[in-house]
Amino acid sequence: MKKLINAVQDVVVEQLQGLAAAHPQLVKINYEPRYVYRVDAPVKGKVALVSGGGSGHEPMHAGFVGRGMLDGACPGEVFTSPTPDQIYACTRQVDGGAGVLMIVKNYTGDVLNFETALELAHADGIVVQSILIDDDTAVKDSLYTAGRRGVGTTVLAEKVVGAAAEAGYSLEQCADLCRKVNSYGRSIGIALTSCTVPAVGRPTFELGETEFEFGIGIHGEPGRQRLPMMTTDEIIEMMVLAILDDGPYTRNVREWDRRGEAWVDKSLTDVPYKPGDQLIAFVNSMGGTPLSELYIAYRKMAEILDQRGLVIRRNLVGPYITSLEMQGISITLLKADDEILSFWDAPVHTPGLRWGM
């Protein structure tokens, strides 16, 4: 294993120390328990956004803390969910009195620990809500989830809902918008190589030189199938059609009923695409894929979407939700109405994403 690290046990702490040293005007770090928060938190009268998950996916989530996105992020160990005490402490830190919205990727550990933290925060008098992101069309269940995994739409939700909170949306409005973004977004990913978790020291899985994994998860979870290597155009066509041709997905998700002070099941269905829809298109590197290859992929994706009568209004290309050094890409398509486009265009200033200021 070759990595630019010192001691395996110090990887997460040292990268956070580097983040704080590089961006002292944007973020602060609390080390016990571990969380990242924006320098001006809590912002009085503004809904605060908190997210988190295992480290190894940088810049998500800590790199998206700042004006126009997250108020706080809770990084666990590599590919390991943050603990309830981390999430609870971060929630207390950023609460400015207007409530806290937790944006949670659908991985079993994340879901359980955020639910526990929400209950602790509620018992402490904090007004809090959580919304689940489950946009991965590759599989319905996996090693880490019941139901679809939460992947690329998470980044888009943090940007859109973060801007809405900055603009003065209430907690209920932010939750409704986040729910809409999740129902409008779909993703799928592929891997050409595995990744190596520092504490493990060997690849998570093996892929031959002439193979790729279709439908991979961001922790190296198995996808739909392992296939012989194809051209980029062939792979991208498979990915885009897997998103566009996937039927409506109905599932029950647990959400916190603040008035009833209990968890309740809600039935949600994602929204299929149709000709004329406006999109935000997100082509993402899994960590080891260069921009040149991302743009080759984007070229083919744009061609297919145009043939289907879908209109790309905005895009994001780069490594924003990674899997350590994995070679591979993911594609996320988000149906975008005027509200979503307006908040996408709004100013953002974080270590990992910045425009408009």
Feature locations, PLM:
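Short glycine-rich or small-residue beta-strand-to-loop segments that form or flank ligand, phosphate
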Residues: 2, 47-54, 70-73, 99-108, ...
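Short Gly/Thr/Asp-enriched flexible loops that form oxyanion-binding sites at enzyme active sites
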Residues: 111-125, 144, 293-299
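Glycine-rich oxoanion-binding loops at beta->alpha junctions
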Residues: 57, 66-97
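Short alpha-helices
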Residues: 133-184
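Mixed-charge interfacial surface used for oligomerization/domain docking
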Residues: 169-294
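N-terminal amphipathic/basic leader segments beginning at the initiator methionine
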Residues: 1-49, 338, 347-357
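Short, acidic/small-residue loops that bind anionic groups at enzyme active sites
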Residues: 73-78, 122-147
